[in-house]
């Protein structure tokens, strides 16, 4: 994630703190993926549950994922690599890891099989899409993590770029959640 914060046409200086931040981000992503994988049953098959099973936090994270996918696509279309990298970094660190995984933990351990299954499905779905969005910036790490996901294809490189899915857009839930 060394391109995070870079601007088109400008040289970047080597900054040790930026290297440390990139290492910390990769470690955070690696640990988040390990957490998700260790909470999946062996017979898990990926796929989002029906909308009526999603709770407010699920709708919130899916809305945020939609927003970051749309914004990153626009940034990359305009060759704004630094902005795109910053957006996926912020989404993975701040939204997915710091909030959604923490919110999902009680559901995973609640004893309610349906709630736990819904949480697992959303965790895997969002992680899959986030890895695809991050892939241009961290190809080796994202490939390794993607291969560990259940139902993953041969390689992340041949997968479709995540696009905005209007069916996963809940602005009311997003506003109420925040």
Per-region residue spans from a language model:
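Structured ligand/cofactor/substrate-binding pocket environments in proteins
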Residues: 12-36, 86, 90, 120-143
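Core structural elements
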Residues: 24-37, 56-68, 85-106, 160
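Catalytic adenosine-cofactor/nucleotide-binding cores of aminoacyl-tRNA synthetases and other
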Residues: 1-54, 150-156
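Acidic, turn-prone loop/beta-hairpin segments
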Residues: 43-73, 102-178
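Short helix-adjacent coil turns
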Residues: 76-83
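Residues that scaffold the ATP/ADP-binding catalytic core of kinase and kinase-like folds
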Residues: 1, 99, 145
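An acidic- and aromatic-residue-enriched active-site/binding cleft used to recognize and process polar
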Residues: 3-6, 17, 24, 81, ...
